[in-house]
């Protein structure tokens, strides 16, 4: 019997481990609602979440859910670091110029806003929409950042990327490192301007959930958040160049039409459709929203309607009732082993309207000795 156990010890351990995971997932499937829960990306060592973040789909609540055009949607509470609403929010999607949100914060954190940037032929040759930078000429980093974030100029994004990263490839590496650092494991960027691209690894993409976390970091958590907000809240920006005076206008309509939007970035490519990511502050709450594939020509205004619907939903009673129970599995590095598994069961805590705050069970299985 002892010989048999030793011979098959590793297989037995594997079977036990699989059974434990199966039980965790099985418990999850019994929950009646799936909705607002901690984003796994915020735990950098997360392996996977046992459930997709979606609003509970039952007859009573369907009536109150926002009616949206976007293919992929996320609504995020930046203070609780939880999701209020999700629709296909973990799907890998082309995200167009919303990429420039991360381009901007990486540039602000890695370079001086008063740097002088010399324009390459590569940057000058970027397609519309563009400022019309002249190869060989020099521009101020600050002016390029405003051009990129207010007017979404593609040549400005490339000029910034080459200056900060040494090349667009080098800058893409910095972007992906930052995304990973803040927990956005569903994001992979290739271009600094968000134009569709692919390489041997993957295609240029993010998720609605990740983009909310990226915007939350940029607006409130980065050491350069103040500069980021100053740029993205500016309605009009004027500066002088060798080519004459330049005037940039902000295309974020929610800044003009609401009193709660504090930052945002639009985007469009044929593949991505119309996209929009925003940071808002309403009724004492700090939130981010993300809309991907929100219509194609001639439906340019869908994103504004969807954004407003999401914000109204966020402060409604319907959103307060959409919390859920959830189970998750995460890795934890303990000592010299990376084979420690944490299983956490999280109970709905409706009494104080907070979710994923109380761990009823938090037990650890160290499988490092079995494999």
What are the residue ranges of the model-derived segments?
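Enrichment for repetitive, rod-forming helical segments
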Residues: 13-18, 22, 107, 364
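Domain-terminus/edge residues, biased toward the C-terminal soluble/receptor-binding domains
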Residues: 9, 29, 184-185, 200-371
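Hydrophobic alpha-helical membrane-insertion segments, chiefly the h-region
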Residues: 20-30
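Active-site-adjacent loops and short helices of periplasmic peptidoglycan-processing enzymes
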Residues: 2, 31-209, 219-221
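N-terminal Sec-pathway targeting helices
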Residues: 1-18
């Amino acid at each position: 019997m002892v010989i048999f156990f030793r011979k098959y010890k590793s297989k037995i351990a594997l079977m036990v481990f699989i059974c434990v995971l199966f039980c965790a997932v099985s418990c999850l499937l019994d929950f009646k609602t799936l909705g607002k829960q901690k984003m796994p990306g915020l735990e950098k060592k997360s392996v996977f979440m046992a459930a997709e973040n979606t609003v509970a789909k039952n007859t009573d609540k369907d009536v109150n859910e926002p009616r949206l055009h976007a293919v992929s949607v996320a609504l995020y509470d930046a203070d609780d670091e939880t999701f209020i609403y999700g629709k296909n929010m973990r799907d890998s999607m082309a995200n167009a110029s919303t990429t420039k949100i991360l381009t901007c914060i990486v540039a602000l954190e890695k370079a001086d806003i008063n740097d002088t940037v010399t324009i390459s032929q590569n940057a000058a040759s970027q397609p519309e929409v563009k400022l019309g930078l002249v190869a060989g000429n020099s521009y101020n980093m600050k002016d390029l950042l405003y051009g990129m974030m207010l007017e979404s100029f593609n040549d400005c994004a490339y000029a910034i990327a080459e200056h900060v990263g040494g090349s667009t490839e080098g800058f893409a590496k910095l972007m992906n490192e930052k995304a990973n650092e803040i927990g956005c494991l569903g994001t992979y960027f290739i271009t600094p301007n968000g134009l569709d691209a692919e390489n041997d690894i993957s295609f240029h993409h993010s998720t609605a959930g990740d983009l909310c976390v990226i915007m939350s970091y940029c607006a409130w958590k980065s050491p350069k958040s103040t500069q980021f907000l100053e740029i993205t809240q500016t309605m009009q920006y004027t500066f002088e160049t060798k080519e004459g005076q330049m005037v940039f206008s902000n295309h974020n309509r929610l800044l003009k039409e609401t009193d709660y939007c504090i930052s945002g970035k639009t985007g469009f490519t044929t593949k991505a459709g119309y996209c929009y990511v925003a940071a808002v502050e309403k009724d004492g709450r700090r939130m981010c929203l993300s809309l991907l594939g929100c219509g194609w020509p001639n439906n340019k205004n869908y994103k504004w309607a969807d954004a407003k619907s999401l914000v109204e939903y966020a402060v409604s009673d319907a959103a307060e009732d959409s919390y859920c129970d959830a189970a998750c599995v995460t890795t934890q590095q303990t000592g010299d082993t990376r084979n420690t598994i944490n299983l956490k069961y999280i109970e709905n805590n409706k009494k104080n309207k907070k979710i994923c705050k109380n761990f009823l069970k938090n037990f650890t299985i160290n499988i490092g000795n079995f494999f």
